[in-house]
């Protein structure tokens, strides 16, 4: 009986970390490390452990702090904390423990990696969750900074510092975030309105929000071109990443011409792999450059 209870509790604690989201953010860190020319296996393994723990910990703290909002929305009311299966104190303690261990591991790589890790936690919890999420539709920009922190950490782990190129790569995540969050918030518009969360579709309407998503996608393509033209990334990156971004831009333009809540869910699913493919292209470009120069 105790074993079963332990398994259920462990499953709930794992749920707090949002494994799919955590895995995607972890990949951005690993792929950026490789794209930045990182070749040390020990540093890569340490980075993987540090990011897995720190991202999971930050997400768990976020879940604890957002439990009151989650309890008001049918989509999220069965999550571990709002459902009562895990207490807020348990979720906070679990999350902080994971983050502290992850931060310690990131410092073993170098101080800049630890700085990027801390930046992610600070923006996600203090700026996004506790300050802006319940006040402004622009909160996702600050959430985007948190989402971009793992890629900064990956670059810092490889290069020992955070350079302009790293910031430009991090901007990819920030520009992708509107598609990731706003399409799903269009689909669940009534839930966010009932919970009084000022998401863009609630405050600005579906049409304006869909046009802003198009704008962010255009900027993302410009950024990809700049990363190629300014030199940190080569033709492999552009050839592999640009087609999927252009395809997604076309889909978002079509949606903006005739937006609907039903179609927003499909657009959310179309948006999901875009970031993964872009960062995979960054990694493959880095591998190609290493092989070419050897």
UniProtKB/Swiss-Prot annotation:
Transmembrane segments: 19-39, 41-61, 89-109, 111-131, 138-158, 166-186, 218-238, 272-292
Localisation per UniProt entry: Cell membrane
Protein name: Protoheme IX farnesyltransferase
Sequence similarity: Belongs to the UbiA prenyltransferase family. Protoheme IX farnesyltransferase subfamily.
NCBIfam families reported in the protein's UniProt record: cyoE_ctaB
Gene Ontology CC entries for this record: plasma membrane
Keywords: Cell membrane, Heme biosynthesis, Membrane, Transferase, Transmembrane, Transmembrane helix
Membrane association type: Multi-pass membrane protein
Pfam families: UbiA
Protein's UniProt keywords contain Transferase: yes
Main location: membrane
Reaction catalyzed: heme b + (2E,6E)-farnesyl diphosphate + H2O = Fe(II)-heme o + diphosphate
Pathway(s) this gene product operates in, as recorded in its UniProt entry: Porphyrin-containing compound metabolism; heme O biosynthesis; heme O from protoheme: step 1/1
PANTHER family: PROTOHEME IX FARNESYLTRANSFERASE, MITOCHONDRIAL
An example Gene Ontology molecular-function term: protoheme IX farnesyltransferase activity
Its biological purpose: Converts heme B (protoheme IX) to heme O by substitution of the vinyl group on carbon 2 of heme B porphyrin ring with a hydroxyethyl farnesyl side group.
Top-rank taxon, per record: Archaea
Note: Carbon 2 of the heme B porphyrin ring is defined according to the Fischer nomenclature.
EC number: 2.5.1.141
GO term, biological process aspect, one: heme biosynthetic process
């Amino acid at each position: 009986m105790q074993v079963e209870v332990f398994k259920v509790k462990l499953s709930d604690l794992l749920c707090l970390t949002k494994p799919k989201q955590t895995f995607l953010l972890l990949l951005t860190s690993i792929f950026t490390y490789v794209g930045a020319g990182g070749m040390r296996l020990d540093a890569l393994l340490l980075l993987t452990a540090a990011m897995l723990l720190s991202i999971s910990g930050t997400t768990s703290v976020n879940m604890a702090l957002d439990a009151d909002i989650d309890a008001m929305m049918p989509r999220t009311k069965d999550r571990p904390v709002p459902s009562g299966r895990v207490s807020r104190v348990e979720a906070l303690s679990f999350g902080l423990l994971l983050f502290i261990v992850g931060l310690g591991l990131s410092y073993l790589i170098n101080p800049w990696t630890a700085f990027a890790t801390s930046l992610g936690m600070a923006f996600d919890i203090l700026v996004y969750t506790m300050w802006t999420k319940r006040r402004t539709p622009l909160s996702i920009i600050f959430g985007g900074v948190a989402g971009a922190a793992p890629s900064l950490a990956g670059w810092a782990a490889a290069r020992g510092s955070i350079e302009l190129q790293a910031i430009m790569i991090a901007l990819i995540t920030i520009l992708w975030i509107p598609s990731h969050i706003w399409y799903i918030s269009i689909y669940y518009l009534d839930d966010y309105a009932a919970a009084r969360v000022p998401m863009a579709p609630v405050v600005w309407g579906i049409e304006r929000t869909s046009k802003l998503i198009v704008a962010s996608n255009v900027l993302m393509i410009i950024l990809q071109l700049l990363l190629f033209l300014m030199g940190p990334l080569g033709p492999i990156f552009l050839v592999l990443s640009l087609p999927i971004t252009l395809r997604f831009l076309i889909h978002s333009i079509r949606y903006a011409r005739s937006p609907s809540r039903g179609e927003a869910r499909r657009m959310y699913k179309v948006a999901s792999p875009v970031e993964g493919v872009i960062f995979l292209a960054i990694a493959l470009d880095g591998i190609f450059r290493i092989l070419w120069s050897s």
